[in-house]
Amino acid sequence: MRKLFFTLLIISIFAVSCTQSDNASQVPEGEYIQWRSENETADALVLKGMFLYMNVEQEMAYTYFKSSLDFDSTLFGSHVMLAWMSPPSEVKDMHQKNARELVKGKNENSNLLVSFFDVLPGDDLRARRHKVWSKMYEIEPDGRFIHYYYAITKPTLEERISELEVLLERQKNDNNFLGVGHILNRLGYFNYGLGNKAKAKNYFDQYIKAYPDGYNAYDSMGDYYSNEKDYENALSYYQKSLDRYPANRSSINNIREINDLKAGEE
């Protein structure tokens, strides 16, 4: 079974890499985070892992980043992402240690990414993270991963929305490999947080159209309907998410919570 899964994974990697734009297939010049690998398979795994992570499909993203290290063990960025996705454990500590060691000699933005290990939970966490992202954005404003986190860590929802709208237009215009789905998703949640419910739903609709094969887009629409207490539609979208990825913990938990709530009302 494991051999079959790995074979299917590799097939999907090359299918993705063949459809990527020329810009994605070459390492760009500039002070970008140095994620990339000279190994073609490792590089495709990293790019796909980034795409999945940005779309909050972390269960799958973890597999891609972990597999990238099988082809290139020097990828500090993969260790960073695996550490971020791991609970406190020896495994998390191992990934942090490897990232700190492997980033030596890399550019400033790569080292700043690793420095987030030292931005510990506590008061003003968002502001402290934004300070680092702001420095990274100042160094390389064209870095789309950097720009996204620079945007979503801004102080207010209004500021985050405004900056994400700027990024959305950039992504639409240059066909960046990360796409626009993750931006549409976040704009949906942020607008809902401000009470702009119609606008939020429109963004979630756009997200599904932009990424119809993903599972998080349907989970997000399920959240919209759940927050509106339209539980039948919520269950429908959570199930659509599970149809695309049966191990999605968010949809599994949300379906359980809604069913428990409905049972309590009977």
Residue spans of the language-model regions?
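Canonical tetratricopeptide repeat
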Residues: 81, 149, 186, 220, ...
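Canonical positions in the second alpha-helix
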Residues: 67-68, 98-102, 135-136, 167-173, ...
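Helix-start (N-cap) detector for alpha-helical repeat units in TPR-like alpha-solenoids
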Residues: 42-43, 76-77, 109, 144-145, ...
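Short coil turns that delineate tetratricopeptide repeat
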Residues: 39-40, 73, 104-107, 140-142, ...
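Alpha-helical adaptor scaffolds
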Residues: 115-119, 149-217
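Register position in tetratricopeptide repeats
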Residues: 54, 88, 121-122, 156-157, ...
